[in-house]
Amino acid sequence: MSSALRGKRVVNTRALHQACQLDLLLERRGAVPLSYPCIAIEPPEDFGPLDQALRNLVRGSFTWVAFSSANAAHAIATRLETLGMKRTLPAGVLIAAVGPATARAVLDSFGRSPRIIPGRHDGTALAFAMPIKPGETVLAPGSDIARSELTEILGEKGARVTSIVAFRTAAGSGGVDMPLKLRERGVDAITFSSPSAVEGFFERLSRSGLDVASLVRIPVACIGDTTRETAERFGLAAHSASSQSLDGMLDLLEWLFVPVGSGGTAWS
């Protein structure tokens, strides 16, 4: 069956090392991926606090590990290997993950599935979903720009939380000439899988002098309500998928382009 995305030029804003997965999914639906990395994942400037937290983790000092992103899981696994430790989590530690993609990263990285995955995939929902007992210890690895809701709510529930920078979210670079594509109306849709990608998109465009008001004509598909809300704050006509995954985001985008009425689409 022909896809409504066939021939559509879709911007992929994921970090360069993660972009190929979405590119392949777009191509399978007949779309034309336009790579425009809006974030880059880099190591912490100081590994000291992370390394100490990992030594404590291996010694069994934590009741829980709460992963707020797939990047956090990959960063922890990589650093354990670098330190000469086993790429595993202690058998007794409980694992929570913010969503299905993060849960898959945990399984791939450590061979274990999280005990807790909330229905809504953000830090607030993760914190409320975790059955914390007062005094339990939680390791919360994340980005240098991670939101504070996870650690704040866990603290209010009585947990002793160690929030640690496992990676840095930096500005993206490379990809297509986005200002030119937009001026020539060479973009049919934009995708965002994180709030930081939205912010990075506008940071990159701000250097070009492009009138971002022209973006309101372009449909935007997001993973997660937090990402959608961030896009809306920038004035975009954003939508979030009911299934918070890459496939779910593309299902949403495809629905937006399904023909309806006399020559229109669900989007237009």
Predicted feature locations:
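Conserved beta-alpha
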Residues: 1-268
